[in-house]
């Protein structure tokens, strides 16, 4: 087993991740989805991770060449980044999501944008998605035009592209424009998760409640699978905030999404946030991806622009 990297931060309640061969899945939980069988086996020879990047594209230092329509003002620096080793192909798993089969914890770190800190000019968000050992699993890059970002701010519609170690887009998250006021339950928030891009595998929809933030995780047929329930006050000072992942009857807790406290200075002057996700190891891979989408929706709904 590879030791954690020096400086790797694990939030409270998150145990170190063990090799898949040494871990058995947790007991069954109420409301757990089952595996589907409509995906083909990815081709063998899936390329392994790279220790660093030497190929750059215009405006995207550190990435292999890609044709993604990402805004040119973004700069992503990932030189000398340690990536999670590429797992073997898995039956009935969307290409690029094999990593999630070996993971029961994810850490999401939003990059601090100096331009945004100094000028208040809203830029496209960029996130690092790591496992509990600090190894990079994915990178998430927002793709939104300047006018939309600065006019709609946290309520803006966006496309979030999830890239692997080769710079290939393995997931796409689409959030439509909807009124974010809690007084209008007819305009509840939602996000669509696609893997591969263009193929919906699930949705996250807001469930109206007068006091609590609630989300419903759905499969590709829009059938309800899991619930996410947050605290009455989603913004607290000097402490982590837990959004519990529960069964549909909200009785059994199977995981959580944690907004981690980043310190007074970072919280006060930036909207750069850190999150942790914990879910069962044997949860269906596509529902793990939908849970990741729920984390990003929570960030934009409750914490984006809260500095």
From Swiss-Prot:
Membrane topology designation: Single-pass type II membrane protein
Tissue spec. comment: Expressed in erythrocyte membranes, blood platelets, blood leukocytes, T- and B-lymphocytes, vascular endothelium, spleen, thymus, prostate, testis, uterus, intestine and colon.
CC cofactor: Ca(2+)
Tagged with keyword Phosphoprotein: yes
Keywords per UniProt: Calcium, Lipoprotein, Membrane, Metal-binding, Palmitate, Phosphoprotein, Repeat, SH3-binding, Transmembrane, Transmembrane helix
GO biological process, one term: cellular response to lipopolysaccharide
Protein name, entry field: Phospholipid scramblase 2
């Amino acid at each position: 087993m590879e030791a954690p990297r020096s400086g790797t931060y694990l939030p409270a309640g998150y145990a170190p991740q063990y090799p898949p061969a040494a871990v058995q899945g947790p007991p069954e939980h109420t409301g757990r989805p089952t595996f589907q069988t409509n995906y083909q086996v990815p081709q063998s020879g899936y390329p392994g991770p790279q220790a660093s990047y030497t190929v750059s594209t215009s405006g995207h230092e550190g990435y292999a060449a890609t044709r993604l329509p990402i805004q040119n003002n973004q700069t992503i620096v990932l030189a000398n980044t340690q990536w999670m080793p590429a797992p073997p192909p898995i039956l009935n798993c969307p290409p690029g999501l094999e990593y999630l089969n070996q993971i029961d914890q994810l850490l999401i770190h939003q990059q601090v944008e100096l331009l945004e800190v100094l000028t208040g000019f809203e830029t496209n968000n960029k996130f690092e998605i790591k496992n509990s050992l600090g190894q990079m699993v994915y990178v998430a890059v927002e793709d939104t035009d300047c006018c939309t970002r600065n006019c709609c701010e946290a309520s803006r519609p966006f496309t979030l592209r999830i890239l692997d170690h080769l710079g290939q887009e393995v997931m796409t998250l689409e959030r439509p424009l909807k009124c974010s006021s809690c007084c209008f339950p007819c305009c509840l928030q939602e996000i669509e998760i696609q893997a591969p891009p263009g193929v919906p595998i699930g949705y996250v929809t807001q469930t109206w409640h007068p006091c609590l933030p609630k989300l419903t995780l759905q499969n590709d047929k829009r059938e309800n699978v899991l619930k996410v329930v947050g605290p009455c006050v989603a913004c607290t000072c000097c402490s982590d905030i837990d959004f519990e992942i529960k069964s549909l009857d909200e009785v059994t807790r199977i995981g959580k999404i944690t907004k981690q406290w980043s310190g007074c200075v970072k919280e006060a002057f930036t909207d750069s946030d850190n999150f942790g996700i914990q879910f069962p190891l044997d949860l269906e891979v596509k529902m793990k991806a939908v849970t990741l989408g729920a984390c990003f929706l929570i960030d934009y709904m409750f914490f984006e622009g809260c500095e």
